[in-house]
Amino acid sequence: MMNMKKNIILFAFLFVGVLTGYCQQSAYLFVYFTGNRMSEEAVRMAVSLDGYNYKALNGNQPVLDSRVISSTGGVRDPHILRCEDGKTFYMVVTDMVSGNGWSSNRAMILLKSKDLVHWTSNIVNIQKKYPDQENLKRVWAPQTIYDKQAGKYMIYW
């Protein structure tokens, strides 16, 4: 666990150099999951200096505990976005365990971090949040974008 934090912290300094205002971004971050087994439905991270060749962080093991951040115990389809302030990151993931069936996902998880190491999370279950949407069966691969004109972040899936 300590090695993972050291690797991610080192990467965060490379990736988030703009926080100081003196450095430019110097690496790419790729967030991913690896498969359909429970142990594979978790957020992993890899880093690249050129955008083509990536090295998995944390020995290709999860960097977040899916059991802690999700309602199902598994997460898939991570998408990460650097905020307009250049200092904050948002990640959104599907809250799902594929072993429960492909129509079992009703929620997404919203995550926020200032350092790519420490994350806060909130589960958004669409059917519970919006009672008139009971027929909504899937929240697949949510993504985030920023609308400069509206000055708001949006999630679509």
Predicted features and spans:
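Positively charged n-region of N-terminal signal peptides that target proteins for export
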Residues: 1-7
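Carbohydrate-active catalytic/glycan-binding domains of CAZyme proteins
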Residues: 22-157
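Sec-dependent N-terminal signal peptides
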Residues: 7-17
